[in-house]
């Protein structure tokens, strides 16, 4: 990291490498994919991300997801203050990035890649969920609290786990 990065006494001047980009699209996101993507973006380009923010529709949630960040600091949460998605309102995602040497197309593609996936399983299906090892479970709910699945593990405790992303790393078809 540049040693002058946090020097508040330094002169600040912006050149033509500093730009902003915004994007809006209809649809809903998987918040777990979003957090993973933002984390990667901060690690790789955080020094050049001066400011970023957005209001997003997350699958399985009525509240709007509001996020903002400065460089490598990121915060995001569901906000009832901003408002809930109203019945019939088009659920959409909007974001703005301000920074140096931004690649608008890559930022758009990164956010679009976080869209909520079409689920492979339905309520009541038997699956194997990864809880450190793959363990037999039953899908209790789809799109619960922003997660693709809530699974009841089929053991004595009947504990519930959320599956953050619908792929074979997290959940597999049962026999």
Tell me what each language-model feature is.
Residues 119-131:
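Short coil-to-beta transition motif at edge beta-strands of beta-rich domains
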Residues 147-152:
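Short aromatic-glycine-enriched beta-strand elements
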Residues 135-143:
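Short beta-strand-centered aromatic/proline hotspots
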Residues 131, 143-146:
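A generic structural motif
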Residues 1-93, 102-105, 109-119:
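C-terminal accessory "lid"/substrate-recognition subdomains
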Residues 119-120, 155-175:
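Intrinsically disordered, low-complexity, charged/polar segments
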Residues 64-70, 138-139, 161-167:
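Short amphipathic beta-strand/extended segments with alternating polar/hydrophobic composition
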Residues 97:
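Flexible loop/N-cap segments at domain edges
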